[in-house]
Amino acid sequence: MHNIVHPSAQIGNGTQIGHYTVIEADTFIGDGCVIGHHVVIHAGSKIGASVRIDDHAVIGKQPVSARRSKTTVAGRQLAPVVIGDNAIIGTGAIVYAGCRLGAGVLVADTASVREDVVVGDYTIIGRNATIENRVTIGTRCKIMTDAYICSFSEIGDDCFIAPCAATSNDNYAGRWKERTKFYKGVTVRSGGRIGVNATTLPGRVIEPDGMAAAGTVVTRDIPEGKVVCGNPGKVLRPVPSNQLLRNQEE
């Protein structure tokens, strides 16, 4: 069962590598990792100890820019990906170069994490979720199945983004050549939450412990500790005290 491991790659003690895996030049893989079958780890990738990378995952992919791309810089060679200790990368997941994943992060099956993204410790990126480029995500967040986080977004610590939640960064919906000056994704402060199938419009801010209920269209900033619902979203009530971040057990 043939693997291709470049002679310059450093493989830690006790690391297991599956069949038909490619590990390119100058890669570092820590001790006790488990690398599945048909995995591709691109040149220079830095992978910590006790990391699990499942079958068909791609680590350190350089982005491709279309002629009309507005947020991807053509020809820019990004720094190698860095993956912290005890992370898990699911089957078919893609983690781009220029990305930093903290310790204990889970990137679930078929999820995609683009370049220039930072993900804090113990955050979960759910199955088939998409994290576009130039995004910052804090620690202990949950970005659930099929959620879409657009470019230029900032998500604080202990945030929850429910399945199929969508964010946007272009108020001009692809029209007007000057629009790129005004791109801005969502900002979710620590403890903020977005419900199932909610849509957040460009530049909106969800303050700490703010909540967008399921199906909400967020057209205005959400105040701290308030639940917003409807289309357009309006304040419904305060977040119950037992759901506030400060009242949660570790």
Where are these regions (language model features)?
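Structural signal for interior beta-strand "rungs" in well-ordered beta-sheet cores
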Residues: 2-66, 70-229, 234-235
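C-terminal end-helix/capping segment
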Residues: 232-244
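Phosphate-binding loop/pocket of nucleotide- and phosphate-handling active sites
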Residues: 247-250
